[in-house]
Amino acid sequence: MTNSNLRTENHFDYVKIKLASPERVMEWGQRTLPNGQVVGEVTKPETINYRTLKPEMDGLFCEKIFGPSKDWECHCGKYKRVRHRGIVCERCGVEVTESRVRRHRMGFIKLAAPVSHVWYLKGIPSYVAILLDMPLRDVEQIVYFNCYVVLDIGDSKDLKYKQLLTEDEWLEIEDEIYAEDSTIENEPIVGIGAEALKQLLEDLNLKEVAEQLREDIATSKGQKRAKLIKRLRVIDNFIATSASPEWMVLDAIPVIPPDLRPMVQLDGGRFATSDLNDLYRRVINRNNRLARLQEILAPEIIVRNEKRMLQEAVDALIDNGRRGRTVVGANNRPLKSLSDIIEGKQGRFRQNLLGKRVDYSGRSVIVVGPKLKMHQCGLPKEMAIELFQPFVIHRLIRQNIVNNIKAAKKLIQKADDEVMQVLQEVIEGHPILLNRAPTLHRLGIQAFEPKLVAGRAIQLHPLVCPAFNADFDGDQMAVHVPLAIEAQTEARMLMLASNNILSPATGDPIVTPSQDMVLGSYYLTAIQPQAKQPKFGDYSDTYASLEDVLQALEDKRIDLHDWVWVRFSGEIEDDDELQKPLKSETLKDGTRIEEWTYRRDRLDEDGSLISRYILTTVGRVVMNHTIIDAVAATS
């Protein structure tokens, strides 16, 4: 983080996500008050007092830990108003500050026994299992108190390090160790639960294991080699991030700020609360009960059962339903855990951070715009007037059409011709960005020149559809207006659709006709079997130029699939080039007429072409005329 800027906001170079140590977790939530008291640990499961409706001290909404629930007011009411800013009340210990600190101040729960982090234990792949080089099933047996694991073999010759033992097997070994005739001096050490897992992870020397793995990889092959590489990769990542494997076992749990898991009073006096509060409450209750059982030296079986329950409560808090039975609330609805809040389409990242609403943007259904140029898109007038409103207001005032913003807005609401004229001037040369989710590659966002259209749908050129993976069956697209002149320049130079013809991934053309265009081209050039071919000289079906055919089509004197004779002087390709004409006739003036299947040529005495009529369909005339025009425009 750079410290060069002395303003209130901090400028970050990057955000790094890595494992947090137990000390770091406690550091997040711990604060030392001016009187020397350290606060931050949440020890009580209570939320608010049902009589006073104020947060309970040391509870999940504690004002001493998280800050006051009312601006500039302590819990007991001794200090009120902003003039007491920064004072810590000597009676209740609450700092007099703004209530918004409750959105970022954290707390923590110090656990009476370590618990495994369910993401690293039950994730795919399981990092704990990979690091320990043990099957996931065996690691689970240890964590959930089904099996003991050997941590130190001592003098025993029958045991192996990391060997799993059932309750009965361990009892037998214990009997041998403590028998009168036993020769074992160094007793083997076994463990169970997350404490044993933590011990196994602490025993790992990552650098030595990595060195050994590199030697083994050099001499192994196949499935075994792939497994070793997988383990080495995980170990190298731990070394690179300076994280210790035992941090995957939690000694303290962070408690997120109370305003991010609120409790709201409803009209009937009842309360609606975030599911996280219920999950935190389960953890605190079980943690306190475990601490009490350890204090009174309760039997091992009871303590172990409570530790397992604590492990399950923490699992449910972090990722409810990942392992074991899903914790449900009222009306059998699964409670939303921290993972549920973060992950998925409706999660914090995709919904609230990446997908947040922005100014100067809109969204609408897309329809095909066949008359558009490739770099253009049809923008509905209603949408354009809203997106470009500040620009329109500025221009209306500058042109002295109105005197102030209020008058300009009234004029815009009427949407008369004057406003539309100004809007047309504003959007001229101002590119807009179109984006279709999901944006899987850079061509998912492209720039276009807007053209005002009637209706409420955005019109899109059919050739750019493959880049967006869009079709016209109800897809929606978002519109964004680049504001800065640099952004507009970048959009025009780099992002314009006509500049993005090749795929950045493969280099192949991405602007290819597909779907409607292929079908349309086929329909346009298709021949109807039952259509009658006219004889040459039939006045009603003979035309002097391609333009005459198009004019006749526009006047609805002919249809797309009608056969016509049309005079054409350009190059043609024909299937019967190598064959002889069907009929050849020399006229009195020395010119020769040649009749072929689909054309009729008139040649002079030297064999040079005087005129040519071709037999074709109206649709093919439309197709060829369009292509000839396009080629002429680019050359």
Curated annotation (Swiss-Prot):
Catalysed reaction per UniProt?
RNA(n) + a ribonucleoside 5'-triphosphate = RNA(n+1) + diphosphate
Q: Which domain of life is it from?
A: Bacteria
Positions of Zn(2+) binding: C74, C76, C89, C92
> Has the keyword Secreted been applied to this entry?
no
User: Which parts of the sequence bind Mg(2+)?
Assistant: D471, D473, D475
Instruction: Give EC number(s), comma-separated.
Output: 2.7.7.6
- Give the cofactor note: Binds 1 Mg(2+) ion per subunit.
Family, according to the entry, reads as follows:
Belongs to the RNA polymerase beta' chain family. RpoC1 subfamily.
NCBIfam families for this protein: PRK02625.1 (NF002729), rpoC1_cyan (TIGR02387)
What's the protein here called? DNA-directed RNA polymerase subunit gamma
Q: Where does this protein come from, organism-wise?
A: Prochlorococcus marinus (strain NATL1A)
Question: What taxonomic lineage is listed for the species of origin?
Answer: Bacteria, Bacillati, Cyanobacteriota, Cyanophyceae, Synechococcales
